[in-house]
């Protein structure tokens, strides 16, 4: 039909608009405050790995603001630190967790990673080491030097502090008295109590010193005037234990300091077996730790985990702990509080190799009734391989809140 309009004009096809491709938003482009909030919700176990991503991440992870937010949100974790003395240097490690995509099959994903430590610090086995809050305090120490033909020992009064948030070291005010490796240290209500290990007379005013981290000042505590215990082994020492808001001291006498009464008094013979928890040369104790104000040990002979019941002054078996390898031939064992759980470390020497493996297990705890505590092995795995000369016998395990 020439010249006539078609009955229905065909609609012209309009070209479809090409899809707009939006570039993915990089986490690096997020505002700093938002990143802080995101990181505060992540477990501290992942921080060592995250710090390797970029300088920005590393800056956030070591910032004071991050840990203030974590504290306000009640997101703090208890983290495990392990220190090996080796030669004149010390090697510090912390337990962390690998990202899920990097975890091998049948692996727990946990490992110990090294923390920077400056040269020049006195060997840790000659010092007293303890944690308060997010800081590890390395107190005193022994340094040997040669004077003419004689080898002499010098004690130190210095205090080095590792901030476990930034992994930076600093110096704290020194003690009034220099102390060596035979000093004993404990923590009660956020204060550090260190005794002995000095050349002062046993009745000296400064035989016990007290450090308050809040005021950064040293003070003294009434002296119990107990002598060194001579049957601990090759060294004469006094041992201490901070538990239930009290200080227990074990030497020639066994005494306890009650802060409410402001006095020392002898503990009853029914509590003498508490001594097994602090004496590494004890026939019973292999290692010990305090979790939620309950004292736990690993029995050397039976390799059974036990806890101390103050009501009846007896050690009771921790029920339900199954699945761990036989620890009787694993050398020295360490235990430490891991946020309401027990972390257990032991070593394994590889035959014909100069390598030693460090194993770690995590045991969760449950109180049933009031007279029973049950444990469950959550996982155990190899977390570190070191030179065979490293030994848990001289190592320190510390639990830090960050």
Swiss-Prot record:
Give residue ranges for domain F-box.
24-70
**Top-rank taxon, per record:** Eukaryota
> PROSITE patterns from the xrefs?
FBOX
Q: Which Pfam families match?
A: F-box, Kelch_FKB95
Which SMART domains does this entry report, sorted A to Z?
A: FBOX
**Record keywords, A-Z:** Kelch repeat, Repeat
> Positions of the Kelch repeats?
135-189, 191-240, 246-293
| Tagged with keyword Glycosyltransferase | no
Q: Could you identify this protein by its name?
A: Putative F-box/kelch-repeat protein At1g61540
Protein's organism = Arabidopsis thaliana
């Amino acid at each position: 039909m020439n010249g006539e309009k078609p009955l229905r004009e065909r609609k012209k096809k309009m070209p479809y608009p090409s899809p707009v491709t939006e570039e993915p938003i990089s986490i690096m482009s997020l505002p700093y405050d938002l990143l802080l909030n995101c990181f505060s919700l992540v477990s501290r176990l992942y921080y060592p790995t995250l710090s390797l991503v970029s300088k920005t991440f590393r800056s956030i992870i070591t910032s004071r603001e991050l840990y203030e937010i974590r504290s306000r949100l009640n997101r703090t974790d208890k983290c495990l630190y392990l220190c090996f003395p080796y030669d004149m240097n010390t090697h510090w490690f912390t337990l962390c967790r690998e990202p899920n995509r990097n975890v091998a099959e049948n692996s727990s994903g946990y490992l110990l990673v090294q923390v920077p430590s400056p040269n020049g610090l006195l060997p840790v086995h000659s010092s007293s080491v303890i944690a308060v809050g997010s800081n590890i305090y390395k107190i005193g120490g022994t340094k040997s030097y040669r004077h003419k033909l004689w080898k002499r020992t010098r004690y130190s009064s210095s205090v080095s502090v590792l901030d476990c948030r930034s992994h930076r070291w600093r110096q704290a005010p020194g003690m009034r008295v220099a102390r060596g490796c035979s000093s004993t240290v404990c923590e009660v209500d956020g204060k550090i109590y260190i005794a002995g290990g000095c050349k002062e007379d046993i009745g000296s005013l400064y035989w016990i010193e007290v450090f308050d981290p809040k005021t950064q000042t040293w003070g003294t505590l009434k002296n119990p005037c107990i002598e060194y215990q001579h049957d601990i082994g090759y060294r004469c020492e006094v041992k201490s234990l901070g538990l239930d808001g009290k200080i227990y001291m074990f030497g020639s006498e066994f005494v306890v300091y009650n802060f409410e009464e402001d006095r020392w008094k002898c503990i009853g013979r029914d509590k003498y077996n508490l001594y097994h928890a602090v004496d590494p040369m004890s026939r019973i104790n292999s290692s010990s730790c305090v979790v939620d104000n309950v004292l736990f040990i690993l029995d050397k002979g039976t390799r059974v985990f036990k806890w101390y019941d103050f009501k009846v002054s007896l050690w009771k078996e921790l029920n339900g702990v199954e699945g761990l390898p036989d620890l009787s031939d694993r050398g020295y064992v360490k235990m430490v509080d891991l946020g309401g759980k027990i972390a257990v470390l032991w070593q394994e020497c590889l035959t014909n190799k100069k390598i030693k493996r460090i194993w770690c297990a995590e045991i969760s705890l449950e109180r049933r009734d009031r007279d029973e505590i049950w444990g469950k092995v959550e996982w155990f795995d190899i977390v570190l391989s070191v030179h065979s000369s490293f030994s848990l016998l001289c190592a320190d395990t510390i639990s830090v809140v960050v």
